[in-house]
Amino acid sequence: MSKKPLILGIESSCDETAASLISENEQGIPIVLSNIVSSQVEVHKEFGGVVPELAARSHIEKIDLIVKKAIDASGRRVDEIDAVASTAGPGLIVCLSVGLSFGKAFASAINKPFIAVNHLEGHALSPKLSKKLNFPYLLLLISGGHSQYLNVQGLGKYIRLGTTIDDALGEAFDKTAKLLGIDFPGGPQIEVLAERGNPNKYNLPKPILNKGGCNLSFAGLKTAVLKVAKNIKTDKEKFDLAASFQKTIEQILYKKTKIAFKEFEKQNKTKEKIFVVAGGVAANKKIRSMMIRLCKEENYQGIFPPMDLCGDNAAMIGLVGLEKFKIKDFSDLGFPAKPRWPLDEKALFLKGAGIKL
């Protein structure tokens, strides 16, 4: 029986300090031996959002302990680790630098290869941690910082089909929650409040719904929510607005995903039609339910990461590290932190461009 690679994954791109040990079985299926995540919710709560300097300081204070916990929980020894994989971008540069520097130093100390990982690629491949997944597949990546449709051809091979031209979906959820007086991080609570409201009470806009192809826009929706929120006086109205917002998001994603299906099918002649939804917002149960229904309608196999792997974590970083290790795709210790690092580097940068569609 050949020794299987053991990879230490490290994540610090925003406000989670995380470490994980990843290996694989004889069939080549990834195995998560440990996955430790330390959240900074309490650190940023009073500010209503992530404060980069405070986040970086928290990473510095915790990262060595989190890595030790991950190694201890895995039941493996430091001298068994074959490579260290750290998130190098995209993200907050002061936060990225902590995990990146620690990972490089750790790899150097144990004289093992270092692997720089794209955080978005971690999300893109995360379903492989719980399910065998063949390329190509269509990916909807929805998180606090990104919202995009991607044709995933293989490791490091991505074709962007559409992206947000302004706010990310997770950002829209969090800002709506803030307008409703919900403490940070409020995005997940929108779904809870929506269960108690009337989703048809407010007719909210669906920007670029019938144009722009697979591109998305949420800034206009956020502005509309602000106008309604200013006049809310009762909890019932708050619940109704949350429900209306949730329903509007579902309608936007339903329509745009159908367009993405057609684009994906134009580019791929494969018989197996696979659709993956990943990122923090993929934990939204209403969105999951809607996507499952849509996949049945369009004969797609819908795949979602487990709930605990939707948000930022190091298991997905270790997974990318494992895949890169197997093809000896190692990184130089001088590899820089990249605040912006698109998966499809040939795609036009749209966010904030003020383009007209």
What are these regions (language model features)?
Residues 123, 305-345:
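Glycine-rich phosphate-binding/hydrolytic loop that grips phosphoryl groups
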